[in-house]
């Protein structure tokens, strides 16, 4: 169920100081833009590669985020966080695991932190600009200040037009490259009531591990 350590244990929001560093200023804009939305939907693709070990893993999924609440879906599982409890639903096993907010049992991705992880703990430096389907993507190189993370650096791609995150690339010290690409980013959606409510009645034959 663990998809890899990319996404990662290094997330937190809540305020950071302005800087004359252009990379910091751009990321301030990104954080302010994302924070202004009532909710966000996006799809994602995830690729983990290590050529030396001949490893390649791929998955895709979708996310809905509203403040601290989220629904994360990948092919083998769905995780719902209602602000207090996490509900991890495993259809293949007909099992549901219920844990509290502080438990580190994310499906490789923490949607609460994914959109803000860059705000603390990294040295920042502007990198290349790429043209992707007509959109200018500015990459920022993030070098961890904590050298025990097992990460050489990350590249965070920002769409300069929308100020949304487009791609996160992590280069591990063991040669592993992990790429997360956000697609179909949609803010301020009209969500159904109960989007972030777990209803056990929808899973009558499931074992619930509370």
For each predicted feature, which ranges?
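Gly/Pro-enriched, hydrophobic low-complexity segments
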Residues: 122-130, 135-208
């Amino acid at each position: 169920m663990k998809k890899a350590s990319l996404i990662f244990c290094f997330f937190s929001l809540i305020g950071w100081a302005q800087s004359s560093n252009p990379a910091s200023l751009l990321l301030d804009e990104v954080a302010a833009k994302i924070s202004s939305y009532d909710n966000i939907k996006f799809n994602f693709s995830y690729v983990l590669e290590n050529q030396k070990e001949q490893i390649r893993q791929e998955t895709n999924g979708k996310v809905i985020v509203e403040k601290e609440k989220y629904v994360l879906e990948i092919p083998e599982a769905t995780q719902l966080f209602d602000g207090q409890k996490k509900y991890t639903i495993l259809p293949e096993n007909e099992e549901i695991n219920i844990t509290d907010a502080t438990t580190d049992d994310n499906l490789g991705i923490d949607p609460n932190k994914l959109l803000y992880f860059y705000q603390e703990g990294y040295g920042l430096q502007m990198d290349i600009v790429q043209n992707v389907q007509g959109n200018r993507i500015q990459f920022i190189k993030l070098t961890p200040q904590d050298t025990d993370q097992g990460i050489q650096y990350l590249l965070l791609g920002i769409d300069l037009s929308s100020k949304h995150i487009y791609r996160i690339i992590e280069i591990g010290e063991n040669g592993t490259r992990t790429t997360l690409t956000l697609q179909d980013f949609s803010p301020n959606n009209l969500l159904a009531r109960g989007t972030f409510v777990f209803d056990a009645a929808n899973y009558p034959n499931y074992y619930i591990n509370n």
